[in-house]
Amino acid sequence: MATIFAIETSCDETAAAIVKNRQVCSNVVASQIKIHEQYGGVVPEVASRSHLEMLNQVIAQCLCEANLSWSEIDGIAATCAPGLVGALLVGLTAAKSLAIVRQKPFLGVHHLEGHIYASYLTEPDLQPPFLCLLVSGGHTSLIYVKDCGIYETVGQTRDDAAGEAFDKVARLLQLGYPGGPLIDKLAALGNPQAYPLPEGRISVPGGGYHPYDSSFSGLKTAVLQLVQKLKKQNNSVGADGFLPASTINDIAASFQETVAKSLTKRAIDCALNFGLTTIVVGGGVAANSGLRKHLQAAAAKHNLRVLFPPLKYCTDNAAMIGCAAAEHLQRGHTSPLTLGANSRMAVSDIMELYNSH
């Protein structure tokens, strides 16, 4: 059983965790949401500086909560791709330094593989093959999980990621940042059938549509046009220039319903067509109540098993990175200390991060 000390700094969460196979010994996350809120989104340079300021404190707290010494740690891991390069470098450099000083194996981990492994933390018997629906602020993908490190992307967004669309629509509705939780909250108060919105399908040469790829830019534009149209109707706008709360709730509900149904349809069709009986959901949008409701209901109809990670493992954290690293280390995979940070990297290239022994 491998015990891993892991660091995650790919975007705006400074995180460290200690994981013993699938058991979390400690999991510390310092969020930068309050810092980036004023900008309406993540500012890369600000994120990197904040990681530098917070990381030592997060590492110390992580060790303290686990009540473990370095002699009990088998390997040290950090997210190395994809993400904001400056942010990644902070965690990557810290992990390499610790690996050298403590004389431990080092492992670079792909951020999306971490999200795949988030459900492993609470599902001790989960094993491939299965389908992963990965939905976050930066990614929306359907990934065929064949084995540890062996993945095939069978569907993805052609433009905005689902989480990105939530943030942009929240901005259109003047709700604030981050948009996902805010829209989810208001959607519960609105009518999801109030405004029909386009699903966003991808046409293919020769006719028809791609069965698993998605598009959210058209949906975002449709919401923009709807907001503009409603604002032109004098009775729809208050003296402050804002739409009434009930209208905003209905738009939020209609938007969330459209995204949830679109993702659910593609995930169910994909699992059935590939003969997979389990769908694992990962990423920040996995926390969305609309997606959870639609996917669980549709899966039950088709006798498919759907696994959502606990809410604390949906958003970025280091426990999921440690879980993935533990599996790799047990298979004899380690990374060279020359490994760099990458803003982009396909999940099909993950094994390039490791030397196999």
Where do the language-model regions lie?
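N-terminal beta-alpha supersecondary unit
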Residues: 2-82, 111, 115, 251
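Glycine-rich phosphate-binding loop plus the immediately following alpha-helix
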Residues: 124, 147-191, 220-229, 234
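Conserved phosphate-binding/catalytic loops in two-lobed NTP-binding clefts
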Residues: 108-109, 296-320
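A contiguous, well-structured pocket-lining segment that forms one wall/lid of small-molecule binding clefts
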Residues: 185-279, 290-297, 301-302, 349-357
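Glycine-rich phosphate-binding/hydrolytic loop that grips phosphoryl groups
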Residues: 309-347
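Short glycine-rich phosphate-binding loop at a beta-alpha junction
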Residues: 70-80, 274-286, 307
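Conserved phosphate-binding catalytic cores of ATP/NTP-utilizing and phosphoryl-transfer enzymes
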Residues: 1, 109-131
